[in-house]
Amino acid sequence: MISREPTLERLAVARQLLLEPFGLDETDLAKTLAEIKAHKVDEADLYFQYTRAEGWSLEEGIVKTGSFSIDQGVGVRAVSGEKTAFAYSDDISKASLMDAARTVRTIGAAAKGGRVKVPTRKVASSRSLYGGLDPISSLNSTEKVELLGRVEQMARAKDPRVIQVMAGLASEYDVVMVVRADGTLAADVRPLVRLSVTVIAEQNGRREVGSAGGGGRFGLDHFDDALAQSYVDEAVQCALTNLDARPAPAGEMSVVLGPGWPGILLHEAIGHGLEGDFNRKGSSAFSGRIGQRVAAKGVTVLDDGTIPDRRGSLNVDDEGNPSQRNVLIEDGILKGYIQDGMNARLMGVKPTGNGRRESYAHVPMPRMTNTYMLGGDKSPEEIVSSLKKGLYAVNFGGGQVDITSGKFVFSASQAFWVENGKIQYPVKGATLVGNGPDALTRVSLIGNDMKLDPGVGTCGKEGQSVPVGVGQPTLRIDGLTVGGTA
C-alpha cells in the first residue's frame, strides 16, 4: 500500500537528521540542483544518508567483539546520456553541496540562458512496508549479550558433540533522503537486523561446521527464544549431519534443490542477467529476448521489493522511486528486466524501483530486492522420490557466476545422495556447475512449498553490497554437472 502520512513522517525524520543540524533547507537543495541544471544534463540528484550500526559477537561465553559506528554524507550525481558524473562528501554543508554541483555539472555543456529553475517540489508517495524504529535501541546492551548467551546455551544443550559456538547480532538504522532535479523529494527510514549462529561439532576426531540465522527490517525484540531455537536447531543439525557425510559423487545428473535459501542459485545465475545495465549493453545471456521462452513451462520468477519486513524490501529505492513487484519470467517467457532510472530511460521503459546503492559514496545501479520463483503443484516428497539416482541439495554456501556466459559454480553446504527415490546418506563436497539460462530450461518439477530465505542475504556487484532476499520452492533440475570428491 502506498500512503501519504507515513511518507511525511519519514521526511520529517530525514530533515531532522540530514538537513536541520547543518543549517540546510529545501531551498538550498533546489539551488544546488539548479547549479547542476545550468548545464545540459538528463538527470541530477542529491542523496543524503545517515547510518548508525552496531554489532556484537559472542564466542565461548565471552563477548569477542563489540562495534558501533555512525556515518553520514551526501552524494551528488549528474547524468548525461549514458555518462555519469558523481561526487560525494561526509561534510554536509551549503559549500560542499555547491562544490560538488559545480564538479558534476561539467559532464554536460553549459545551457543557453544560464540558470534553470528546478520544478516545484513534489513529495513522492512511498510504501509502508516496515516501521521506522531504531532497532539498536530496541534492546539494551545487557539484553543483547543475554540473547547471544541464550543462543550459545541452546546449542550446547542440543548435543554433546557441539564443542564450539559463535553467535552474532547486527543492527542498523539507516535514514536516506533523495532530492531530484525533476522536483521529486523522497525519504526512507530503514531498520535492519540479523542474528547468526555457527557451531562446530566433533565426532571421532572429525569436525564439521553448521551455520544458520535470520533477520529483516524490524527490531531486535523480534528474536524471541522460539525463533532463536529454530536457528540453533538448523545449525546443529547441519553440523551433525555432515559428521556422517561421505564424499559426493561426480558427474551429470538430476538434482533436487531445497526451498528457501537455495534460491541464491536463481539470484546469481539468472537474476543478475536480468539487470537492465547488462541488457542495455548487450552483455547478458538474456539481452534482446523479451517475449521469448527462456525457461521451462511453469517457471515464474519475480523480483519483489514490496514484501513487508523483508531484508531486501524498500519503501522507495535509492533514486526515490517506489519499490514494485516485477514479473521477470512468466511461465517460462521473459517479460522484463530490473531497471534503475538511467538504464530505463536509455531503453525506453519505466524504472522498476530497483535503483540501489551501497551508500551515499556510491552511484545507483539496477539491483535485485527479493528475487524468487513461484511454487508449482508437486509435493517436495514427490520430487525427491522421483530421483532414480541424483543429488538432493538442501542448502548452499557460496557461488560465482559469469554474467555474460551465464556459467555458475555453487557449493552445497548440506546435501544427500538419493537412489530409487530414497535418501541414502549425506554427502560433502558437492559443487553444482552449469549455465543459468540453460538450467532454467531443465527445470522438470516445481514444488508447492515456495519459501523465502530467513533474511541473511547480501549481494555484491561492482564493489557494492546491498541486502537482498531470495526464495524458491523445491525444484528438480535435470542434467546438471555435479563436481564431487568421490
Where are these regions (language model features)?
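N-terminal small-residue-enriched
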Residues: 1-486
